[in-house]
Amino acid sequence: MSTNIKIIKKVLNGYVGFANLPKQWHRKSIRRGFSLNIMAIGESGLGKATLINTLFNRDIITSQHDSDEFDEGEEEDVSVKIKSTQAEIEEDGVKLKVSVITAPGFGESINNVEAWKPIVDEINSRFDSYLEAESRINRTAVVDNRVHAFLYFIEPTGHSLRALDIALMKQVHEKVNLIPVIAKSDTLTDEEILEFKHRILADISHQGIKIFKPTDFEYDEEESANTRSIIDSFPFAVVGSTNEVQTPDGRLVRGRKYPWGVIEVDNENHNDFVKLRQLLVRNFLEELKEHTANVLYENYRTEKLKRMGIEQDNTVFREFDPAAKQEEERALHEAKLAKMEAEMKSVFQQKVSEKEKKLQRSEADLFARHKEMKDKLTKQIKLLEEKKAQLEKQKLLPQDPPAQPAPQKSRKGFLR
């Protein structure tokens, strides 16, 4: 087949109508709505729920939703739980479906060596469910639940990244659009924030961690300058607050009030919240989704199919092989069954472990009750033996003879 395609350019003599395509796309997008899946990860108390609510200017999640739920007596076995919250919000007729995934319990255990594993499993599970839906014959109802943006909240220590931070980011940086965030930056001075940013970026570069950077369109100077400003602000030092406070000049702003002054959430001179909002929502929401679909998901899909023994070359784009397609579907089905089996085994092992712990607690209670009853019985036996000894001792002592009754005097005048 010849690849030399001759393109003939002609000037149209009349209005055809394809110049109306952007309007068609706009109407379709408004009718269909948009979606955004955000994973917000970090230790408890770093203001994840507050920042998400500040981003969308409404209560998407509550602080209780992200609280750590574990027994006080088992703090050494804190487990990471995955929680998801969905909300549909509307602004000027445009609908946005927001899904926020959090991981309460992350970093709260004594041993955090594999604290990242449930988070990575959740990301992979979402890729797998999308791959499964995409492989069906009827794909009209494919729901995109893949993670579009991964906000990692860094504790504002002012030093450098911890081993846990590096371990998690190295596990997820090739699966998600990683966006590091310095939480509660109002606890640091401007100089400390600048130095902290340099150390974080140095650690990220040294570890080979990839973070999401928006595309710089050089042909648009204003847009390019805005993009470079966003990139230069990495990692974002943010402050979140949904409360309004009054500034010294009388303005009502979203922010936090301190004895030394007011820090404004929406003021770029105070923190990087505005730049984070531009990256996530205002300017690059669709780019985040496209990069997830065209790069991150495709890389995951290719690697997964290779592990399953399915090789793909350029011939699939030139012809359709039903046998190969059937083999691919069979392999995907087997992978799905294997995944379900692994999940069932995991649930079974978890239930067995919980049952064993319950039996161990019951056994300990029974031992304690047995010991208590044995101690009581021993005390009763000892008490009875003491009483028996006292009785035997009393028998051995000499007893006084019984008193003789006094002789009765005979009455005179009567015969006896």
From Swiss-Prot:
Primary residence: other
GO cellular component, one term: mating projection base
Annotated segments matching region Disordered: 392-416
Region (G4 motif): 183-186
Coiled-coil intervals: 323-399
PROSITE patterns (alphabetical): G_SEPTIN (PS51719)
Family annotation (PANTHER family): SEPTIN
Protein name (database record): Cell division control protein 3
Taxonomic classification: Eukaryota, Fungi, Dikarya, Ascomycota, Saccharomycotina
